[in-house]
Amino acid sequence: MEDQTNYLEIFCYYIEKVYICIRQTLMYKITYAKSNTMNYLVFATAMLPVVVLMYIIYKKDSLQPEPKGQLRKAFYLGVLSCFLSFLISGPLNLLGVFHDNVSTLLDAIRLSFFGAAIPEEIAKFAVLWFFLRKNPYFDEKVDGIVYAACVSMGFAALENILYLYSNIDNFMMVGVVRAIFAVPGHLCFGIMMGYYYSLVKFYPNSKRHTTNCIMVLLVPILLHGLYDTMLFSFKTLHPVAVLVVFVTFLFFCFKMWKYAARRIEEHLARDMNTGTEE
């Protein structure tokens, strides 16, 4: 009887999550049904950074650009991964592994890793693997980065839309902040996942093959978790400490973006010198 009750709680939790997503997505149309101009503006604000970053990544693949249809499929799978992440974070929340209310630094760490980084990056990896496992277009090292970036942008697009629609009164400010930090952050997580994914595929006999297999998930999870921990910890810190953490956060973002850019150039160089063993 107790097991049935637990299953019912989990089922109800998932139904509630789906309902919340649908409600947040439709909330704006219900509240602002008479203002189509505002509707388009909010949607454009959410999507603009995603489109710009996808275009930049697409242009980086200059040797053999990927078919646009394949990129769209990867993007849509990224949107799907947003829902798949609930299948992981839901039970962890019910089990008390993390809580949405953050009052201590430990709460921030648990929410950042178990509520966001781990379930979200695993979900992205799952759809990336499903998409690339027998994909004939995945024939260059940089392709792994391009497709993983598109998956991450699909995830970021839906997340951005939900955030802006749920903060409709301040959507422009929220949109600008997320365009500077959150969306590029997801792009960097995707770049790192794709970087190691390509190393695993194209260098199966490398001495670092096992390490690369681990790094496919470990690196994006660590980057994502540290990124979110600094953001969530603001609520728990003294005002002076908040300033220190904010400066650290800016430095972290700059180094992460620079590091991700170098990884793209590395794979582009490898593709131009095909045959070099890793």
Each language-model region and where it sits:
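Short hydrophobic targeting helices and cationic amphipathic motifs
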Residues: 4-8, 14
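Short, positively charged and aromatic/hydrophobic N-terminal segments
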Residues: 13, 19-20, 27-34
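Hydrophobic alpha-helical segments at protein termini of multi-pass membrane proteins
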Residues: 28-278
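Positively charged, low-complexity intrinsically disordered regions
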Residues: 5, 24-25
